[in-house]
């Protein structure tokens, strides 16, 4: 008789045990595993998926052999655990045997009394994984959005799990999901309403796209920025309940044209980074060609200290114009190690030691994101209402002293 693909009792093994066993062990029989009563799939670890299943097994008084096989299924045999439930010390596993050259094992189980026993079998399985995605729909005024979080389950493990409970490692578990063989299924695991969002404009001299024929300019990028904290709807529809996993985000904007049916315009898509509680997620929308930033160096002086040791006094000027009707919040990113290398020479094997100096336009607008990264926050006014007037220029000076360089 051929072994069935997965988790079936082997009547052949039962016959072999009966023939090889001495007369005194004639009561020893092989228990056939019945169908699963409950299956739970836990997907919190991206490298290993835990499966727990419960069955009711009928045991004879004395020693029983229970066969467990997993042909063509990606189970890690070193992780398989058999646990009797709600029987205290009346049932115990006394031995585990692994038949050679087979994807199988045999539990030797001792029962003080005959009867039906609920058991839980758990194991790690491969090729059963999950990915995450999002759908962000912004309101017409772009002040709030609705964020939906989806999980897609991919089952290429070699086993049909049927109706199962599924847990992503956060949020609520889902019951009664059909997890079939060679199947993928997407489920909505979170819907967050009225999430506050800011439309920000970002300038980065080193990563920004160059502007043709403008050597001192880089294109500004547009981003939606949302914070993973409870700042919107209350209760189950609030952000900040768990860290948001990495995944693709599709971004839409509600169409608010008067006299027309409500619709949504597709703005683009971006990869949302892993976002912890109280951290920010930035979603790229595209280039902002109506916000101009020009970066120039106003001061670059070296101050000798001793030998080859020196300080470098630097002033960088940012000249900004906003051609949009509405005001804009501009973030200017600078990496202080890279800024130091720009003026002190590259190839440094140490972190920059730096201080803001007095000629900085407004030190309160310079936020330290880390030891060596800063963001300058500048609010730009909208363009004048008069068509013949140009937007005002906004200037910001960043005055930095790099200390003890060589």
Language model features with spans:
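Long, intrinsically disordered, low-complexity accessory segments associated with secretion
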Residues: 2-6, 11, 15-406
